[in-house]
Amino acid sequence: MLVLVLGDLHIPHRCNSLPAKFKKLLVPGKIQHILCTGNLCTKESYDYLKTLAGDVHIVRGDFDENLNYPEQKVVTVGQFKIGLIHGHQVIPWGDMASLALLQRQFDVDILISGHTHKFEAFEHENKFYINPGSATGAYNALETNIIPSFVLMDIQASTVVTYVYQLIGDDVKVERIEYKKS
């Protein structure tokens, strides 16, 4: 089962669109679920995601126009409970102790958060944490040179194989990270 994880598009305020090389990789009919950390900013970005998969889950970012998106969400995909939050609520941004607290509050196997615009994936106390970064490479308050990235999770029974796609220069680099539920 393929799950696309992305966020912080900031279209059209900070970027015009997804990188063309990412659009070529993201084709309709291949992905079953989309988990988005927010800051899509417009309905057009949401409509684009709906063309890729029927099951789209979005949480509200601090720049989203649509106030109907929830602040947080817990989704079950296969054997995994996945928590989804934008991340502007985590202080300081990306703080491990704050993320671990949220993971325990949500009681999830995987916690997905964004806001920092920087990709991260790691295991902590037998739980898995993912920050997909910014799919467009949009700048943030602290940095202008952001590497565009998104994540594809391949969920098979009690294992998640995470593929990280990063646009470095003109090349899409892919890294593979495996997490087994204990």
From Swiss-Prot:
Keyword ATP-binding in record: no
Modified residues (N6-acetyllysine): K50
CDD domains: MPP_Vps29
Subcellular location: Cytoplasm; Membrane; Endosome membrane
Disulfide bonds: none
Function: Component of the commander complex that is essential for endosomal recycling of transmembrane cargos; the commander complex is composed of the CCC subcomplex and the retriever subcomplex. Component of the retriever complex, which is a heterotrimeric complex related to retromer cargo-selective complex (CSC) and essential for retromer-independent retrieval and recycling of numerous cargos such as integrin alpha-5/beta-1 (ITGA5:ITGB1). Component of the retromer cargo-selective complex (CSC).
Name recorded for this polypeptide: Vacuolar protein sorting-associated protein 29
Gene name tied to this protein: Vps29
